[in-house]
Amino acid sequence: MTDNQEIKPKKLTLGNSKLLLNKSFDSLTGVQSFVNAKSKTLVEVRKSSIGSTTTISLNKERNSLDQTVIDSNKEEFNRRLSILKKAAEQSKLYDSAQISTLSKLASINQSVNSKNEQFTTDKAVEQKQQDIEDTKVEIGTKIVQDDEDIRSQIPNKKKETFAKSLLVGMRTRYGIEAESALEKIGDNKVVVPKIKLEEPKKFKKADLFNMLSDDENGSGRTRSLASIKRAREKEKRKLVSQIPEKVYREVTIPEVIGVGDLANAMSERVADVIKELMKLGILANASQTIDADTAELVATNLGHTVTRVQESDVENVLINDDKVEDLRTRAPVVTVMGHVDHGKTSLLDALKSTDIAAGELGGITQHIGAYRVTLSDCKAITFIDTPGHEAFSEMRSRGAKVTDIVIIVVAADDGIKTQTVEAINHAKAAGVPIIVAINKIDKPDIDIERIKNELYVHEIIGEEAGGDVIFIPISALKKINLDKLEEAILLISEMQDLKASPFGLAAGVVIESKIEKGRGTLTTILVQRGTLRNGDIIIAGTSYGKVKKMINDKGREILEATPSVPVEIQGLNEVPFAGDQFNVVQNEKQAKDIAEYRIRLAKEKKISVTSRSSLEELLLKASGNSKIKELPLIIKCDVQGSIEAIAGSLLKLPSDEIKLRILHSGVGPITESDVSLAHVSSAIVVGFNVRAGTNALTAAEKTKVDIRYYSIIYNLIDDVKAIMSGMLDPIVREQYIGSVEIRQVFNITKIGKIAGSYVTKGIIKKGAGVRLLRDNVVIHAGKLKTLKRFKDEVKEVREGYECGIAFENYEDIREGDTVEVFELVQEQRQL
């Protein structure tokens, strides 16, 4: 048998021999066993948890030791086998007693040998363990040397932070616990402890946490995640327990306040405020408003102090008094008024050398324009051009409110007209100086004195007659006497000593506003006090916003506007009304508060008007006169001033039977929503200088909504007036058509009394209305039931012919009675 052949168990046994026959190795547990013939394990060698290099060297030593033991066992086995063979051959020569004695000797010998073998194996294992211990010491020394080399290259401030990651790297490199391998004492002494071999530990979350933590203390103790979680929860409980002491505030409460605003003023949660309201039996959300009394109860219940203020106090921030030392001379603001086509726009063209009349339909100015003219001596005049048509009286009235001087233009060839008188009344009401410009003096056959005499009737008296009005004959077309007009304006402005402060927050008036596609809300304003700058927050009526851009009357963008300067601004959230006062405020919150206050006032006023109107309708119904018809309209215009002028003119149309109702009005093109509203309310859509979009036109065609376009306001008013006239009930009146004299009365069976009559005048018709007169007193009024000529029924009988007649439900007819015949005729009424 060779050394490489597999050793198989022998059937022949010698007692309890511990002869080593085989070895085995378990790859899962890392255990190598040496087995004897009875499958009893003699030696078990376990794999250590040291690094790969040490493990290989130990395995080599173990294999060499095992091979030595196996070789010695083989030799002993062969020796004993030869002895057994010899004993078997000699057994024939000895008796059983001798064989028994030999067996006992062999057993004793085997026991002694077994003890020797066990001793040899224990010595080998002990030697192997000593070698492993030596290897561990070498590894520990190597770790210390590497650690010192690396630490010497690290700055002092980072050594402690880097130590943890360094030891972990060593542990990975050499396969042992780095924290237990080294213990640093002082700066130079290193003690290498005895290292206990154990299986590699499974990598846990705590190990990851330790590697990522920046513990500068270098503590080797590892905290579990559960411990960390408990510590954090404890910190949270401490924070919760440290609730700050509640602060009670002094709350200012206006007449109406929102729930959310009240909560913010008290620094309370909205939910707490809502709970307090629910205790009072009020269900409200954060966006709803409550009255001052309810708000005071809520604030008091929450421990706050309440100060009540009037809601109108929000506008107190708009009051600014100018200091006398800050006042500076400003340019005069001149308003040009007059009748239609008397030359107001042409006069402005001549003054500022621009042709704006070409852009006006029919030479009629449709909305206010503001212009600034700089004269040759660098003095400036601001002109406001108001329309001359009577429908724009509201706009002209606003123009008079903001002006310093009024120029009334009168055509020398036309004289005083209705709008001229109206302009005079507005100027007188404003209490401003008046200059009368008698225009078109270049035309032949004019009489200036006649114009002056007509103005005297309206208490417009010239200086030459002892009055204070300046008359200047001019020709805007030929530019005659324009310099005299400018001199008169400057003279009056110097006499008035016009001044304003350019400092402080700006204020002024809205001249006009509109919406332009791509630019948004455009508002023309006139600055009256302070200086308006880009970025200012302004409030105008119920509109507010930040000034994003300012453009002057020349179309150039500017950064600021001083008193008497008209500009067009962008940035308001909605279109303000012409004539609204604008003010600059400190912040957007102030502007929003003022706007909300004004909106509430407008709603209350609207509700009051609606309630009064509803009461009037109820009284009419109760009186039996409830046949009131309604004409609903939707008005869309290019500018806000036109909306007011159109609405004012339409509402002035006299009618007790037709109620004109403006469902919606706005600035901008006609939209699809306007068409939808008109469809559900059977309204007419009116567009003034605007058109409907494609979608709106498509919707109007489907729903059969009537859309009408206008460019001249009096055409619009005439059409609406005609529509309202068509809705009026016609007038029914009696039209006399003839007379009949009763000459004889006949009683006919089954028919009754028939009056034999003679037509004395006109014509008599069957079914016509009749009045029976006896001694010139009407004793019956009714209808003609029967009309016969001889025995035939006829429709009419003319004058000079005889006929037979009978009345409906009346037979008290006598000879000599007279019958008047009439028809009921309907006539269309006009407003």
Swiss-Prot record:
Residues 475-477 are annotated as: G5. GTP binds at residues 338-345, 385-389, 439-442. It comes from the Bacteria. Transmembrane segments: none annotated. Residues 338-345 are annotated as: G1. It holds the Pfam family GTP_EFTU. GO terms for molecular function: GTP binding; GTPase activity; guanosine tetraphosphate binding; translation initiation factor activity. Residues 329-499 form the tr-type G domain. Keywords: Cytoplasm, GTP-binding, Initiation factor, Nucleotide-binding, Protein biosynthesis. The keyword tRNA processing does not apply. It is found in: Cytoplasm. Its main location: cytoplasm. Residues 385-388 are annotated as: G3. GO terms for cellular component: cytoplasm. Residues 363-367 are annotated as: G2. InterPro entries: EF-G-like_DII, EFTu-like_2, IF2_II, IF2_N, P-loop_NTPase, Small_GTP-bd, T_Tr_GTP-bd_dom, TF_IF2_bacterial-like. Residues 439-442 are annotated as: G4. Belongs to the TRAFAC class translation factor GTPase superfamily. Classic translation factor GTPase family. IF-2 subfamily. One of the essential components for the initiation of protein synthesis. Protects formylmethionyl-tRNA from spontaneous hydrolysis and promotes its binding to the 30S ribosomal subunits. Also involved in the hydrolysis of GTP during the formation of the 70S ribosomal complex. HAMAP family: IF_2_B (MF_00100_B). This is Translation initiation factor IF-2.
